[in-house]
């Protein structure tokens, strides 16, 4: 009888912990995603204002140290004029990038896709400037997902502790 109680209780505990973890993780990821994207949009608006008021002098090599985002300035034709991570002269034309095309048409564009340069899933936000250049701000999006995956070790430890407590409670009945 104790074995049956232990088995059923164990199954319920595992299901409860895993489902709670997945639900909380999903809610956290969605909120993080919303805040991260809005943060990138706000950052792009700030940099756009700086570029339109001060010109290209606003962008320096030190801007990469001031933000976790990648900043890229693209010419009308998609040529890279500035990049906070890579040497622009070694970069290919970006005129075929979805966020660039959308920014050219609508004034802004955004896309989540894999970055070959960063080797990570990245959120890109592009905004057209008054001089028809395009400012693109990008931030990797996998940080919370990686945190959740690394949390599975903690989850496993938590389940083990619960099993030990449950085992002693069932044995003492």
Where are these regions (language model features)?
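Juxtamembrane segments flanking the first transmembrane helix
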Residues: 1-80, 85-90, 146
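Alpha-helical transmembrane segments of integral membrane proteins
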Residues: 4-8, 12, 150-158, 162
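Cytosolic-side ends of inner-membrane transmembrane helices, especially those
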Residues: 21-29, 158-173
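Pocket-edge positions in alpha/beta enzyme catalytic cores
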Residues: 32, 92-95, 136, 173
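Juxtamembrane alpha-helical signal-transduction segment immediately C-terminal to a transmembrane helix
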Residues: 36, 43, 144-151, 169-173
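Helix-start (N-cap) segments at beta->loop->alpha junctions
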Residues: 49-52, 130-155
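Membrane-proximal, non-catalytic sensory/regulatory domains of signal-transducing membrane proteins
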Residues: 53, 90-131
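Structured catalytic cores of enzymes that bind and process phosphorylated ligands/cofactors
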Residues: 69-81, 110, 122-141
């Amino acid at each position: 009888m104790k074995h049956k109680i232990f088995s059923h209780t164990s199954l319920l505990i595992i299901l409860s912990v895993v489902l709670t973890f997945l639900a909380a993780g999903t809610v956290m990821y969605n909120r993080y995603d919303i805040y991260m994207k809005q943060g990138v949009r706000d950052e792009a608006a700030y940099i756009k204002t700086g570029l339109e008021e001060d010109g290209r002098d606003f962008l320096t090599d030190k801007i990469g140290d001031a933000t976790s985002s990648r900043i890229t300035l693209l010419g009308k034709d998609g040529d890279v004029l500035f990049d906070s991570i890579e040497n622009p002269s070694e970069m290919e034309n970006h005129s075929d990038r979805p966020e660039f095309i959308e920014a050219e048409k609508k004034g802004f564009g955004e896309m989540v896709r894999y970055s070959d340069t960063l080797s990570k899933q990245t959120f890109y936000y592009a905004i057209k400037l008054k001089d028809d250049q395009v400012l693109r701000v990008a931030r990797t999006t996998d940080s919370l997902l990686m945190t959740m995956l690394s949390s599975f070790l903690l989850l496993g430890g938590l389940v083990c502790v619960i099993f030990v407590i449950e085992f002693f409670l069932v044995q003492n009945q």
